[in-house]
């Protein structure tokens, strides 16, 4: 049965982790108004596994009557040849950059070099990542305000404005130690920067959100409560944003942003450097 023309099966294939092909594929496909069904096939390092993927791709074409899209990052020649024999549209996410670099550098690429570079830095990167995650979890949602000298960034805002997922994303993706502190209803009478955070105000950044969006998020967990009421959300946001302006704390509206976008914008305005790739 042939599906509608704006539907595509998408395959991400790699003889490595497939993270590169997935990331670039997502970024490109996000610009088109199509519906996709995607599968990821990492570590396709043998002819046998390549033939299995080839069969799946061909089955997709036979079932839908539409050529699937294959984003691939493969350096093993035999594996690459087999995958390219599939009945699909192909997008070689490595070669599109390797070929121009080969010309500009006047050097031949050495695929195994990538693997050795990765191995050499993996141990240190892993330890940095784990340390950042542990620190961030220990300082989530105002649990602790100890050891703030070790923090890379301190996020402030009302409850449910995106602080926790942003903090964890910064830690997991970039090895950044993030503290997040919520201002709650009881803080509103005399709202100010906590004394423990005051010496580190240069690390502080605020997150805010549209009133309607905050009401919707809070109602998902605490429907029809005072906490989720329009009046309470409006009051908290008004007071917290006022404090941000009064204390000259930069802040960002998260309403229409993904966690990835929030984190990237924070890195940009804070000048923080990514600690890992």
Curated annotation (Swiss-Prot):
Q: What is this enzyme's EC?
A: 2.7.11.33, 2.7.4.28
Residues where ADP binds: 157-164
| Catalytic class of the enzyme | transferase
The keyword Nucleotide-binding belongs to this UniProt entry's keyword annotation? yes
Quote any Pfam family the record assigns: Kinase-PPPase
Keywords recorded for this protein, A-Z: Kinase, Nucleotide-binding, Serine/threonine-protein kinase, Transferase
First and last residue of the signal peptide: none
Question: Superkingdom, according to UniProt?
Answer: Bacteria
**Catalyzed chemical reaction(s):** [pyruvate, water dikinase] + ADP = [pyruvate, water dikinase]-phosphate + AMP + H(+); [pyruvate, water dikinase]-phosphate + phosphate + H(+) = [pyruvate, water dikinase] + diphosphate
Q: Name one GO molecular function term.
A: protein serine/threonine kinase activity
InterPro entries under this entry? Kinase-pyrophosphorylase (IPR005177), PSRP (IPR026530)
HAMAP family from the xrefs?
A: PSRP
Q: Give the protein family.
A: Belongs to the pyruvate, phosphate/water dikinase regulatory protein family. PSRP subfamily.
Function description: Bifunctional serine/threonine kinase and phosphorylase involved in the regulation of the phosphoenolpyruvate synthase (PEPS) by catalyzing its phosphorylation/dephosphorylation.
Protein name as it appears in the record:
Putative phosphoenolpyruvate synthase regulatory protein
Q: Mind giving the lineage of the organism this protein is from?
A: Bacteria, Pseudomonadati, Pseudomonadota, Gammaproteobacteria, Vibrionales
